[in-house]
Amino acid sequence: VRRRIAASRSAARHNARLSTDAPTLNFWPMRPFPIAPIYHIISRLGLRVGHEPRDGQPAIAWETGTWVTSRQAAPLPHDAINLQCVDISKSKVERTWEEVAGYPLAVDPLTTAGRLVAKPEENARHGGRILSGPLKRRRKGWVYERLVDCLVDGQICTMRLMTAGGHLAVAYEKFRPEPQWFGGTRLAIPRTPDQLFSAQEQGLLRRFAAAMHLDYGEMDVLRDQSTGLIYVVDANRTPTRPPGLAEKDWASVYDLQAEAFKALLQPWGLA
């Protein structure tokens, strides 16, 4: 409840800085939290925060949970951003990645020998751990994945990629000390997609986002140091600012994100 109150107050403060006749982006079923990059985007684009989806106005399905139910989505217009992105569970990410990339992230923990990753199915649970397989049983509500070797000079290196309207706008290279595999990012460095991914890999990542129906959001990507292969391990339709991103980088990062987001507003003549 407190987070929803904070989101409502943040929206009111944002709207107070704009004229009442400024265009509106309707968020449903939730309003964004104050730390969400979407605030930097809509501030640059002069959009108010609305909470009453209606035809003729842009809307975005905004739910921080893992699934969006048909009941939650019912008030949204048929052309709402992220309307079809109703499942960002870890197993959905795994299935979609294997279908698009042609090689799996998921493993069978009952037959896999050696180290593997176990983590909760639900989004933003942050309960990942490294186990030694094979296991005797699966844990309900958990998924099991290969341990991607992303150690670079003693640092765990992960990548995050922002997408909007099929465009890969900006990436981050994130570092944290071993053995903090699942949290504790110390440094996030903005990169261009070209600096981190080949043209073929960028095409693969765009196809993954399309298969997830992720019109706007972010993907967490790992690169295996032994094979060079990339793996998408998480998809998020309500991104937050990555820890470790220096304030001096905010302006350039959010300028790029706002420019990419314009593509999603073209149907309403707001690009």
Give the positions of each predicted feature.
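Conserved N-proximal alpha/beta basic substrate-recognition cap immediately N-terminal to
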Residues: 4-124
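Phosphate-binding site of ATP-dependent enzymes
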Residues: 129-212
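Glycine-rich, phosphate-binding/catalytic loops in enzymes
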Residues: 77-79, 133-136, 249-251
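Short catalytic/ligand-binding loop motif for oxyanion handling, primarily in non-cytosolic enzymes
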Residues: 68-70, 90-91, 124-128, 170-172, ...
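C-terminal active-site "lid" helix and adjoining low-complexity regulatory extension at the edge
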Residues: 214, 223-271
